[in-house]
Amino acid sequence: MSAQMPGVQLARTVTSAAALGFVPVAIKFGLFDLLVEIEKPAHRKEVLMAYEKSVGSDRKSMPCLQLIDDALYAMAGLGFVDMTVDCVYSANDITRHLVHTPSAQHGALHFTTEALLAGAFLMRRLESGGYRYPFEELHTPLQFAYHEMGNDELAQQHTYDIMAAEGRIDSFNRFMVGKFMKTATAPERLARFEYHLDPVLQDAKSRRVIAMVDIGGGRGEMMLEFKQAFPDLSDKDLVVQEFNHEIREIPGLTLSTWNYKENDSEQPIQGAGVYHLAHILHNLPDLDAARLLQKLSQAMHPQSRLLIHEFTKNANNAKMHASMIALFGGRERSASEWRQLAALAGLRVTFEAYPEGGEGLVEMRKL
């Protein structure tokens, strides 16, 4: 029995790929929500009837019974729903989590749409380029996939632009709001790492500069957490720099625009107390990450801090690492890799925390 386990584990892992392709199908037809609403084990026909009832007279793209069954069966194989030997399906803890945390469904959709497509073309992308590696952000397996599918227009665009053109960016933004689960707030996480933010904020106040800037901060979720934790901070003290033109206002915060990818674009906010980069650098190849850090270094005061919020590079996050490579040419980074990037930008690592799970923290200051 034990001698078979490595083979069993291997088979379970590598045969997941096609099953993951059914995740968008399950989400499209609301199968997770339907199983939770039914509240009891259900045959495939009961699930289809519940779906038909939910859409009412709108019968466009109605799935057949076999598609419902195969999608549910694939979800059972992934552990997302439970099933009996009689092919009766029911919600489990993961099903309920997907329903009660809507952003998790959007995340599942992202990784089984864009990331799954990119992963399928990774080896062919390497072969086509004579195994040149690492990838540049406009020449990843995802762009190669669109090239091979005959869409040369999208094959020349950045992954985010591809998602926008495919009508997928709103879903991705919804994922980024809540991600796969609700974790500790940013202030709670920093406190757990015994990182003391108060002296930095006091210094910014004494220098009469902006307290914190969140670069690529989306809709300001992290800055709002800091505002709640530090009620003395005003709207003007907390700036979100975003280049998503769909975001035009963030109540309680100051919104500004900075496209750090433009070659001649300097960081417009000089000498702030803290500059935040949360899940930005893992989207970037090393050279692009170094350029961004250099721009921030040039804007920083000797007392300024750069706080980098990224996942720890360990076995727990290896799949995320692979996803960043395939989608963006980016990567998660180790302590030594952070120090190398810091040195290239005239910075030094002055604090670091690498938890086994969840987001870590790296602080950099000017040399």
Range-by-range predicted roles:
Residues M1-E153, D203, G346, E356-G357, ...:
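N-terminal accessory segments
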Residues V25, N283-D286, E332:
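Short, solvent-exposed loop/helix junctions and linker helices
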Residues R44-L48, L281, A335:
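An amphipathic alpha-helix signature
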Residues T101-I308, T312-N316, V349:
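Conserved adenosyl
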Residues R305-A345, V349-A353:
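C-terminal alpha-helical "lid/dimerization" subdomain adjacent to the S-adenosyl-L-methionine
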Residues T312, A353-L361, K366:
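A short, acidic, flexible beta-alpha connecting loop/helix-capping segment that sits on the rim
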